[in-house]
Amino acid sequence: MTLQAAPRSAAAQQREPDLRQEVHDAARRARVAARLLAVVPTGVKDRALHAAADAILAHVDRILSANAEDLDAARAADTPAAMLDRLALNPQRVDGIAAGLRQVAGLPGPVGEVLRGYTLPNGLQLRQQRVPLGVVGMIYEGRPNVTVDAFGLTLKSGNAALLRGSSSAARSNEALVNVLRSALDSEQLPADAVQLLSSADRSTVTHLIQARGLVDVAIPRGGAGLIDAVVRDAQVPTIETGVGNCHVYVHEAADLDVAERILLNSKTRRPSVCNAAETLLVDAAIAEHAMPRLIGALQDAGVTVHLDADEQDLRREYLAMEIAVAVVDGVDGAIAHINEYGTGHTEAIVTTNLAAAQRFTERIDAAAVMVNASTAFTDGEQFGFGAEIGISTQKLHARGPMGLPELTSTKWIVRGEGHTRPA
């Protein structure tokens, strides 16, 4: 995806100032809402989250009907199966979305948490505490659950959300946001704490990520094209969320029963998500007898195996039942390969050798490093902090699954008694 659209019609060019104004007006409303939410007690926000969960379940038929329309349009456009899976909702997934809101409601509120405090020799009392970021702009592709995840986490952390989802999920997102806004209104909280930018025009994204002074951070969540375009064109701070070229490395000291289970779970549990394994690395010392077993298990599970993987294969995020395979020379060969081809998301080693595991964890440059565990565990809920707003693959301001603390900044409170600084 690129934010630079093809040559636009005269009508579209005339509408450009209107779109910019619409985005900026929405951002201003969000800013007002964010200032109100910044001082709302955690208990009030938690009640609103439960109200939103109740409302989603009460309107499940409306939500699924809207999603069915999106799916029909996507199938008519020959959308790949992996993308259809991301787009699809069903009663179980809607139940999970509502449960995610309740889980967030049960988490400690980050706003006001004191990170450190002390008194200086001159008597000044200093305290550093968490405060909301403000207005969070979310740009994401066809995953309606992200709409609700973003709402829940931004509300609990005292932020307002400006959402720009994919046109492929437009009906689903609209239905969900309408339900969420009604829930906020019922709890006497500002409905503008969550707004959907509904225009399909890609310039809407540009206006959002260039709304310096109105939007505090932009978080793109989707494929490499979307993320690269947002980071390149943004004039507001951005947090990159994970393109996931994740590896499973089977070390020479691996238990192959364990390796097979981890590999299959990492690849096949949900191949369309960013924490799915995309490359299998096998230690040269065991390749002759391990490869037939591991490759056979993948093929039996319906995975297309790219044995003669070229440069393009090794850098590819398949998001499907496909995987690249390479043989590496020991743990150092695996580390070198991953640091060359990985995207800094999640990397796994399977081994019974503690020294090899330690070397791997110390030298792999990634947000999450697994030892004898599936890459599928890189997830906010699995990490124990509820839904995530994304998995950051950068090193500032957050890294890994982003929950509530990652949606805050800090403020210093300094208390004195008429203190003045000497000349």
From Swiss-Prot:
Q: Gene Ontology cellular component?
A: cytoplasm
Q: Point out the signal peptide segment.
A: none
InterPro entries cross-referenced by the UniProt entry: Ald_DH/histidinol_DH, Ald_DH_C, Ald_DH_N, Aldehyde_DH_dom, G-glutamylP_reductase_CS, Glu-5-SA_DH, GPR_dom
The processes (GO biological process) annotated in the record are:
L-proline biosynthetic process
Annotated region described as Disordered, given as residue ranges: 1-25
Q: Does the keyword Oxidoreductase apply?
A: yes
**A molecular function (GO) term:** glutamate-5-semialdehyde dehydrogenase activity
From start to end residue, where is composition biased (Low complexity)?
1-14
What enzyme category does the UniProt record give? oxidoreductase
> Sorted alphabetically, which HAMAP family does this protein's record hold?
ProA
Protein name, please?
Gamma-glutamyl phosphate reductase
Organism for this UniProt entry? Mycobacterium ulcerans (strain Agy99)
Q: Which gene encodes it?
A: proA
